[in-house]
Structures are given as structure tokens and as C-alpha cells.
């Protein structure tokens, strides 16, 4: 019988993941005795070779929240098709909640023109030349997830 957990961990160790914290927020829950304080961390993990994921972790201290976010991000990894110029194959729109995002391929040498959370997601995906525009929400988490939505809907065209 194959041990699935061992295979998952072996696969995880072979890939060199880079992780970046997008935001850490203090959140409170009102309980009978007062307010219970905890932290929410939004983390992006990627290998800069076309694999990227966004994770969220909540805990009573920041380091545990970040660690949980990294674990969650590794569970939600997507593969991004890259062109030879490290861009995306075509224009795409991403949406998550009220956050809308437009992603357009750009010429080699242009760089990553994006702001906030989408920039982190695109850099960790290994995309070097892209234009993006955020519309709608200012939420870092929703913009990161909108970026993931757009990247997951990319298609490659075979001639």
C-alpha cells in the first residue's frame, strides 16, 4: 500500500518554495469575557518557475499564523503557463469578490508593472514581463486571489 502522506511530503521537499507575507492583520472576536485577539496572515508561496499559491493563516501569534498561511498556500498551488519571454500567453481578467484585475502580456524588458499583492503573486510565479491593473476592491487578499483566478484561467495555444 502506498503511503500518500510520505509521497506528498517528498514532493514538497523537492521544490524550492519561496514565501512572502502580503499582510498581517490583527483581528478580534468578541466573546463573553471581552475581546479575543488573533492575527491573520496572507502569504504567497511560489517557485518562480510557474507555480504559485495564496494561503491564509490565523493564530494567536504572528509566526504561527504565517506558518499556517504557508501550509495553506502550498495546498492551493496552481501552474502558470509562461511564454519564452517570461510573460503570459494572452490578456486575461481575474475576479474574486469585488476585486477585478486585468493582466496583459508585455514586451521583453518591460518588467512587472503591478502594485501590491498582484506584484508579489506575479513575481513568485516567475513572470518577468507583464502589465496589470487593479479595479474595484483595495483588499490585499481579494486582489491576490483575483490574480490567482486570472492566472489559473490562462490557456496556451499550440500551433
Swiss-Prot record:
Domain (S5 DRBM) ranges: 17-80
Pfam families: Ribosomal_S5, Ribosomal_S5_C
UniProt keyword annotations, A-Z: Chloroplast, Plastid, Ribonucleoprotein, Ribosomal protein, RNA-binding, rRNA-binding
The UniProt record lists the keyword Coiled coil: no
Upper lineage: Eukaryota, Haptista, Haptophyta, Prymnesiophyceae, Isochrysidales
Domain of life: Eukaryota
Assembly description: Part of the 30S ribosomal subunit. Contacts protein S4.
Family, per entry: Belongs to the universal ribosomal protein uS5 family.
Annotated compartments: Plastid, Chloroplast
Function: With S4 and S12 plays an important role in translational accuracy.
Any one cellular-component term (Gene Ontology): chloroplast
This protein's domain notes: The N-terminal domain interacts with the head of the 30S subunit; the C-terminal domain interacts with the body and contacts protein S4. The interaction surface between S4 and S5 is involved in control of translational fidelity.
Name assigned to this protein: Small ribosomal subunit protein uS5c
Amino acid at each position: 500500500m502506498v503511503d500518500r502522506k510520505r509521497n506528498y511530503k517528498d514532493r514538497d521537499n523537492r521544490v524550492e518554495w519561496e514565501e512572502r507575507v502580503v499582510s498581517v492583520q490583527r483581528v478580534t472576536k468578541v466573546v463573553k469575557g471581552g475581546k479575543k485577539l488573533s492575527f491573520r496572515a496572507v502569504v504567497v508561496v511560489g517557485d518562480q518557475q510557474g507555480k504559485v499559491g495564496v494561503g491564509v493563516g490565523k493564530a494567536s501569534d504572528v509566526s504561527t499564523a504565517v506558518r499556517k498561511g504557508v501550509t495553506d498556500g502550498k495546498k492551493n498551488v496552481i501552474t502558470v503557463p509562461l511564454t519564452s519571454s517570461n510573460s503570459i500567453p494572452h490578456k486575461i481578467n481575474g475576479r474574486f469578490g469585488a476585486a477585478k484585475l486585468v493582466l496583459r502580456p508585455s514586451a521583453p524588458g518591460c518588467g512587472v508593472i503591478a502594485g501590491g499583492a498582484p506584484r508579489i503573486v506575479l513575481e513568485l510565479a516567475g513572470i518577468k514581463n507583464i502589465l496589470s491593473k487593479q479595479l474595484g476592491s483595495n483588499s490585499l487578499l481579494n486582489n491576490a486571489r483575483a490574480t490567482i483566478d486570472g492566472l489559473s484561467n490562462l490557456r496556451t495555444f499550440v500551433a
